[in-house]
Amino acid sequence: QHHYDASINKWLKNKDGQPEYLTGKLYAQHFKVFVDSMQKAATEIGKKIYIGATLVESPSQGWQTNTVKTWNGMLPELGDKHDFYVVHNYFTTYNANSNAAEVINAAHTVPATMMDFILQTLQTAGAPVKPIALTEWNMWANGSKQQVSNTSGIFAVLVMAKALKNKYGMAARWDLLNGWSNGDDHGLFSDGNEPGIPKWTPRPSFYYMYFFQKMLGDRFIPASVKNSDAIIPYASSYSSGQINVTLINTSKSAVTTEIKFNNFNIGNRFYWYSLEGSNDNGEFSRKVLVNGAGPTLEAGGPAGYAILKSYS
C-alpha cells in the first residue's frame, strides 16, 4: 500500500510538468479532434454548440515558458475549426499592491491594447477573425483589499464598457465566490469567512455591475468629454428612444459636469443613480453608497438596492 501511494505521488509530479511539453500546434491538433467529436455528439441529439480556442492575449515576456511564448503558433494548424477565441486577463501588475490610479488606468487601457494585439496576431498568422470571448477578467492587485473595494466596482464598469467599445463578444468577471484571504478575494460575493459579513453578501462590484446593466440601452453610441481628464463617459440608446450616459469620475474629487446631446431629442426629465465609496480603508473602501444609501454592515452596499428609487 505504501509503494502504491508513492507511485501515485510520483505520477502526479510528472503530470505537473506536462504543460512544459504541450505546444500550440499540438493543442490545435487535439482541439480539432475534440471539436469533431463534440459536434458529432451535439448533432446526434439535435443541438448546436459553439466551441472556442484559447489564445495568449498579450506579447510574450522573458519569464514565461516557451510553451506560452509560442502558443499562438497554433493558429495555422487550427484552421477554421473554432467558433470563437478565448482569452483571459487580470489587467494589473501581478502580485503588486497597486494604488487606485493604477487599477483604474489598467481597466481603461488594457482592453483596447489587448484587442489590438489579438487582431494583429490573427492578421500575421492569416487566421480568420472571429468573436473574442474574454472569459475571465479581474485584477492581480492585492495587499490593500483592492479586489473587494469600491474601486473594484469602478474597475468593473470600465472593463465592461471598454469590452463593449472594443467589440468583445463576451466579458465574464471571475468569479462569484472565492476565499476571503484578508481581502485578496476575487469573489463578487462574500464566502462567509470575511469577519462580520454573512455568506453571499454582495461586494461593491456587484452594485456597480447591476446598475450599469440596469441603465444600459440597446445600442452603444459615441460619447466624448471636453476640458476634463477625470471623467470617462459611455453612452447608449434604447430602441424606445431614450438615451443613457454613464459618467465615471476617476479622480479623488467631485467634478461638475454638463451633458450635451447631439442627434437626440432631450426629454422633460432624467433619472440617475450615483455610486461612491465611503470613508473607510483609504482609496479602497469596502462599502458602496447608492444615492446615499449604504450597508448596515462593515462592507457591501444597500440591502434594498433593487427597489431603490432613482434621483430625478
Predicted regions and their residues:
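Noncatalytic carbohydrate-binding groove/subsite architecture in carbohydrate-active enzymes
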Residues: S7, L12, E20-V159, N166
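Active-site-proximal beta-strand/loop segments in catalytic clefts of secreted hydrolases
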Residues: Q1, T54-S58, V87-F91, T135-N138, ...
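Acidic, Ser/Thr/Pro-rich beta/coil linker or hinge segments at domain junctions
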Residues: F264-Y311
